[in-house]
Amino acid sequence: MRSKSSEGDLQPEDTQSREDKETTATYSEDTKPETQKERNAALDNLAKTPIQLVVQPTPLTPAITPCEAPPPPPPPKPSSDNNNSKRLKVKDQLIEVPSDEVGRVENNIDNFPFYHGFMGRNECEAMLSNHGDFLIRMTEIGKRVAYVISIKWKYQNIHVLVKRTKTKKLYWTKKYAFKSICELIAYHKRNHKPIYEGMTLICGLARHGWQLNNEQVTLNKKLGEGQFGEVHKGSLKTSVFAAPVTVAVKTLHQNHLSANEKILFLREANVMLTLSHPNVIKFYGVCTMKEPIMIVMEFCDGKSLEDALLSKEEKVSAEDKILYLFHAACGIDYLHGKQVIHRDIAARNCLLNSKKILKISDFGLSVKGVAIKERKGGCLPVKYMAPETLKKGLYSTASDIYSYGALMYEVYTDGKTPFETCGLRGNELRKAIIGKRISLAVEVELPVFIANIFEQSRQYETEDRISSKQIIQIFKEEVGFHEIETSGILHKLVNSLPRIHNKERKPAAVAV
């Protein structure tokens, strides 16, 4: 029931103020005063009575104790990326992705299409041409083998090291960890996940035909041994149905070689990739997927030119000497046209096949370019090197021509080493050549045009030397050699060599 009051001032009975709602004074109903005097006395007593405070508690939401599990979240939408219930945290920032979430993947790294085996950074970057291109390669950090993902991102080449966890040995680069490299690559590529700083894997580069599997190569007879490994006669299986091809195989020593030495070994293959000429040894491919690393090349069933010249059983004829020098000039000219400097032209690096075709081989020191400057120690073929190389470390097509003159000396002295009898070795010989105190001389009868080529190839100044094209032109004019395009093999056409008379004898140079 509401009490009446002035208009607009309605208040329910027994309504208390805000403070009265929070704090209430208690007294018994039978002590309620009736008279004004009693009421005043009651008020005095009430003032002396202590007030009891009754605080109404605010209801609280029940807390979840540590032993209680939180309510389950709603089931996620079906997605490979949201399948977190199967994932296990490896570290705070890593999540292990199970194999069934990745999907079907070829887990043998050797068969993975984007894996290129052992490869140097420079060789790798030459293959990355478009934005998003990537490949996986093997390298060495200290004595430990590691895998690197190389990516072309915008205008930069980025090399991301694949790391491994300590306990489970899982592979990771940024956030997710996997049981294999192949799963890591497949997951990031399929789901467009950044492999590093926002970079995604767009286009994987497959291996080329010259990147061979070790299982394709069979090693047979050992033919020799070099600085980095051995040379074997072997066979190469090019396809399931084709017969094996007889090849020469250079194998790299598996022990005690640094990553830089392995890269130097493979530099020969890198130079040979684009070469194809009848007077240059044919390149089949490399095996870099696993040890041993191998370079597979054409097998020449003859000897090296050096062995042929030194042979006492069968002397090299005058006609064949000219033929071999012509073949060598054609091979060198082809290399220079491809901007390749051989840097080790010598009879030991010229191979002969059963058809007496000479082929330039051994590209271990070769470099791409027209001219380079390189200062390095080690064992250098001083007796074949040009003065500018010995003095300043300059290599060019002209320095190859200077070495071609040394090859001519070997041919016409039946395999003698240049400066063999001068009594100087090493640094003493180097200083004598630089100081013009000694020069190479052929003390035998030479055809006039051969003597002229020799003299012009051994000029001290690079600009005074003859070029490979000029040498070939002289051979064609004097002897009549030419190239038959249908077979790509050089043949001797004109029938007789110019007669050599004593009056035509012209020493190319005189030892001082």
Swiss-Prot record:
Ranges of residues in domain Protein kinase: 217-485
Family (UniProt): Belongs to the protein kinase superfamily. Tyr protein kinase family. Fes/fps subfamily.
Topology within the bilayer: Peripheral membrane protein
Annotated catalytic residues: D344 (proton acceptor)
Annotated Gene3D superfamilies: Phosphorylase Kinase, domain 1, SH2 domain, Transferase(Phosphotransferase) domain 1
Disordered: annotated span: 1-85
Biological process annotations from GO: cell differentiation; cell surface receptor protein tyrosine kinase signaling pathway; spermatid development
Domain SH2: 114-205
Residues bound to ATP: L223, G224, E225, G226, Q227, F228, G229, E230, V231, K250
Principal subcellular localization: membrane
Top-level EC class as recorded in UniProt: transferase
Outcome recorded upon mutating V231M: In hc53; self-sterility in hermaphrodites but normal male fertility
Molecular functions (GO terms): ATP binding; non-membrane spanning protein tyrosine kinase activity; signaling receptor binding
Effect of substituting G405D: In hc108; self-sterility in hermaphrodites but normal male fertility
Organism whose genome encodes this protein: Caenorhabditis elegans
UniProt effect for mutating R465H: In hc40; self-sterility in hermaphrodites but normal male fertility
Recorded catalytic activity of this chain's protein: L-tyrosyl-[protein] + ATP = O-phospho-L-tyrosyl-[protein] + ADP + H(+)
Keywords, comma-separated and alphabetical: ATP-binding, Cell membrane, Cytoplasm, Differentiation, Kinase, Membrane, Nucleotide-binding, SH2 domain, Spermatogenesis, Transferase, Tyrosine-protein kinase
Pfam families the UniProt entry points to: PK_Tyr_Ser-Thr, SH2
Cell compartment(s), UniProt: Cell membrane; Cytoplasm
Classification via InterPro entries: Fes/Fps/Fer_SH2, Kinase-like_dom_sf, Non-receptor_tyrosine_kinases, Prot_kinase_dom, Protein_kinase_ATP_BS, Ser-Thr/Tyr_kinase_cat_dom, SH2, SH2_dom_sf
Protein name stated in the entry: Spermatocyte protein spe-8
GO cellular component annotations of the record: cytoplasm; plasma membrane
Bias kind Basic and acidic residues: ranges: 15-41
Tissue: Expression is restricted to male germline.
Biased composition regions of type Pro residues, renumbered to the chain: 68-78
